[in-house]
Regions:
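Bacterial N-terminal signal peptides
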Residues: 7-17
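Positively charged n-region of N-terminal signal peptides that target proteins for export
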Residues: 1-7
Length: 363
């Protein structure tokens, strides 16, 4: 069983205890409705303009128009299992994916949802979705499963990201204006198992695989510029990839050490140019590539974080185990340095530390 499924299983057990059995819509096929929905395990958040849409266990979908201060649960969601990812491309058009290879769609900004695709016989989830606009997109998931659409999801057709006989899980799909093909298209990336990164220059029609020689799972990534990427790996590994030219055929790879061994789950670019990373066990890390420093907080609550959004300067919204919470790196530092504080926050900051690189090391 992969680490991802172990993490999801743990989250399910932890979240069920905070929800009442009477809130389940048994035999209706509709998602759990509960006043405690924002305290359940949340697996992903997506921000479009000033609206945040979040998804989680039991088909829970929530929206916030005040940057996470308050949450409204979706009125109708025809799905009762775990949702894993969500994306909105406009104020009205949103998609969510999850277990049973399910793809949900909303045309009213997340209030009501319908099923665009599912396969309940395929006992595994879609793990990530990326819509380049309201028509074109791709979903990826467990055992190499991937689909694409060019008509807003009216039709989802099979596409081959990987033909590896091992059928490695495809954990995250994303693109960036920072990296473009020779034709000027935004390059699309899929991070997966056994150190594989898949690249498409034609919006997911065809794919090339880059073997990072890292044998563990890759969870997420982000493009820094045309020649640099940051990729999240297992056991707290941050892969800093530098391509030698714009063809992306040759590269060097360093492994940054953030002072922890927790799995890392999400990475976002901050307004000041730094990068923030969320992780399990209360981990939040900020990378400053210009000054080559890492700043890490292990929150006293030790709750696992699945997603992070910048609210304002040094104010971040976290989602994950037990719902949502706000975070400040300065508060974490002050709590750690204040010997009279009863907080269990831990904080550290250091110059980049590069781990010894061992090809095909899975740890």
């Amino acid at each position: 069983m992969s680490i991802f499924f172990k993490i999801i299983s743990l989250f399910l057990l932890l979240s069920i205890s905070s929800l009442f059995a009477s809130d389940f819509n048994y035999d209706t096929g509709l998602a759990l409705k509960s006043n405690l929905a924002d305290k359940a395990t949340i697996t992903s958040m997506n921000k479009h303009n000033d609206k945040i849409v979040a998804v989680g266990v039991h088909g829970i979908i929530l929206t916030s128009n005040d940057m996470g201060v308050s949450w409204i649960q979706a009125e109708k969601v025809p799905f009762t299992n775990t949702l894993t990812d969500v994306q909105c491309v406009s104020e009205s058009q949103c998609w969510a994916v999850g277990h049973d290879l399910t793809i949900l769609h909303s045309v009213d900004g997340g209030k009501n949802w319908s099923i665009q695709y599912d396969d309940i016989d395929f006992d595994a989830p879609f793990l990530s979705i990326h819509m380049t606009d309201y028509l074109n997109g791709i979903v990826v998931g467990a055992f190499g499963k991937s689909l694409k659409t060019s008509d807003g999801g009216e039709n989802w057709i099979s596409t081959v990201v990987t033909d590896d006989a091992y059928e490695p899980h495809l954990n995250s799909v994303y693109s960036s204006e920072k990296m473009k093909s020779e034709d000027g298209n935004n390059l699309m990336f899929v991070a997966g198992e056994i150190g594989q990164v898949h690249i498409s220059s034609d919006q997911g029609v065809s794919w090339n695989m880059v073997d990072t020689e890292y044998f563990g799972s890759l969870w997420d990534g982000i493009s820094v510029d045309q020649k640099r990427k940051l990729i999240l790996g297992m056991a707290g590994k941050i892969l800093y990839v530098k391509f030698s030219d714009e063809t992306l055929n040759e590269f060097s790879l360093d492994t940054l050490f953030a002072g922890i061994k927790n799995s890392l789950t999400d990475i976002k670019k901050l307004n000041n140019g730094n990068y923030i990373i969320s992780g399990n066990g209360g981990v939040i890390t900020i990378l400053d590539l210009e000054n080559e420093t890492t700043e890490t907080c292990i929150r006293g609550d030790r709750l696992s974080n699945t997603s992070v959004i910048e609210v304002s300067n040094d104010k971040y919204l976290l989602s994950g185990e037990k719902g949502f919470r706000f975070h400040s790196m300065r508060d974490c530092q002050n709590n750690f340095e204040d010997k009279s504080s009863i907080s269990k926050d831990m904080w550290m900051k250091s110059e980049f530390q590069y781990e010894e690189w061992v090809p095909y090391d899975w740890q």
